[in-house]
């Protein structure tokens, strides 16, 4: 195996977020309020199963232990189960997760688990069906809830739920969410609304710091847990009276980037060193053939020398990210 991916600031990278499409069938207000609009990439332009097999093999060789499949909505790909199986071929990758809007969970989650999926994140921004419809543009709340139940029935011991925290939308609904997870092994993750190129006005109107929730959780006796090396950026809290957990993702907090352990590859094969960075490093020309793996690993390793110490969100610099469907949030 090649040496562990490490950047100039001694951060080690165990976690790959791999976007497999930027297409989504939801119209979430904070991401794609006007719906998906193709950006010159046809469905045939997204990474193929063989290309995904090659890129994840290279990352596995470079020490990656966890791969998260993102989008867009990953399950819109008809070959999604084959993609999971292709990633599963790498013994070094211990965790394969997906972030999904959940609309196909009930139908397909058992097949995904059989193919090798080990973790699920479902986006649920409200537990009120009408508000869910207003946020997502889809009247599928009950379908998504049934999908979460189906995930437990398929054998997943825990389901993570992502909730984008928005002032005057859901920030005051903590008790409703806590009641929901009291007897369910759900890790509910509140994600601070992040500014993107297309979402400046929404950010100014609805952003609220996750510190407000953290202070309230600590006041109620919730306990901050230690992170594992392949965990994502959430600060996780538990409570003896709850089966579920609470996670807080606060990208505007001081030193948020100090524990960065993840890299991103877009659905068209570009390596992105930061969600809010510029440009990206093209990998696709080295995904054509199995004989290119050594060169692929070398390019990935070399690119890390350019990773910045921190994002520049505090300076309102959102980089290339116009919306979160582009490289998977």
UniProtKB/Swiss-Prot annotation:
GTP binds at residues 17, 68, 99, 160, 262-264. Keywords: 4Fe-4S, GTP-binding, Iron, Iron-sulfur, Lyase, Metal-binding, Molybdenum cofactor biosynthesis, Nucleotide-binding, S-adenosyl-L-methionine. Its cofactor is [4Fe-4S] cluster. S-adenosyl-L-methionine binds at residues 30, 72, 123, 194. It is an enzyme of class 4 (lyase). Its EC number is 4.1.99.22. GO terms for biological process: Mo-molybdopterin cofactor biosynthetic process. [4Fe-4S] cluster 1 binds at residues 24, 28, 31. CDD domains: Radical_SAM, Twitch_MoaA. Binds 2 [4Fe-4S] clusters. Binds 1 [4Fe-4S] cluster coordinated with 3 cysteines and an exchangeable S-adenosyl-L-methionine and 1 [4Fe-4S] cluster coordinated with 3 cysteines and the GTP-derived substrate. GO terms for molecular function: 4 iron, 4 sulfur cluster binding; cyclic pyranopterin monophosphate synthase activity; GTP 3',8'-cyclase activity; GTP binding; metal ion binding; S-adenosyl-L-methionine binding. It catalyses: GTP + AH2 + S-adenosyl-L-methionine = (8S)-3',8-cyclo-7,8-dihydroguanosine 5'-triphosphate + 5'-deoxyadenosine + L-methionine + A + H(+). [4Fe-4S] cluster 2 binds at residues 257, 260, 274. Residues 8-234 form the Radical SAM core domain. Pathway: Cofactor biosynthesis; molybdopterin biosynthesis. Catalyzes the cyclization of GTP to (8S)-3',8-cyclo-7,8-dihydroguanosine 5'-triphosphate. Belongs to the radical SAM superfamily. MoaA family. Monomer and homodimer. This is GTP 3',8-cyclase. The gene is moaA.
């Amino acid at each position: 195996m090649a040496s562990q991916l490490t950047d100039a600031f001694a951060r080690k990278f165990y976690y790959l977020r791999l976007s497999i499409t930027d297409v989504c069938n939801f119209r979430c207000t904070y991401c794609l309020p006007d719906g998906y609009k193709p950006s010159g990439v046809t469905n045939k332009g997204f990474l193929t199963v063989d290309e995904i097999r090659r890129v994840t093999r290279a990352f596995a060789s470079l020490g990656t232990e966890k791969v998260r499949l993102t989008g867009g909505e990953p399950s819109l790909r008809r070959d999604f189960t084959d993609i999971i199986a292709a990633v599963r071929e790498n013994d070094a990758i211990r965790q394969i997760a997906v972030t999904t809007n959940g609309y196909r969970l009930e139908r397909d989650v058992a097949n995904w688990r059989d193919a090798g999926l080990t973790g699920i994140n479902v986006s649920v921004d409200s537990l009120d069906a009408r508000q869910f419809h207003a946020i997502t543009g889809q009247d599928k709340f009950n379908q998504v809830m049934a999908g979460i139940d189906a995930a437990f029935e398929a054998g997943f011991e825990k389901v993570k739920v992502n909730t984008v925290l928005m002032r005057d939308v859901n920030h005051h609904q903590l008790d409703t969410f806590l009641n929901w997870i009291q007897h369910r092994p759900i890790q509910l993750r509140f994600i601070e609304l992040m500014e993107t190129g297309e979402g400046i006005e929404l950010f100014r109107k609805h952003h609220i710091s996750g510190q407000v929730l953290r202070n309230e959780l600590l006041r109620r006796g919730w306990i901050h847990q230690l992170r594992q090396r392949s965990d994502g950026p959430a600060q996780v809290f538990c409570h003896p009276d709850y089966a579920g957990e609470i996670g807080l993702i606060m990208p505007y907090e001081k030193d948020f980037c100090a524990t960065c352990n993840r890299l991103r590859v877009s659905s068209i094969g570009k390596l992105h060193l930061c969600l809010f960075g510029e440009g990206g490093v093209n990998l696709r020309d080295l995904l054509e053939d199995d004989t290119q793996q050594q060169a692929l690993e070398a390019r990935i390793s070399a690119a890390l020398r350019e990773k910045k110490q921190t994002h520049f969100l505090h300076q309102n610099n959102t980089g290339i990210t116009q919306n979160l469907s582009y490289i998977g949030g």
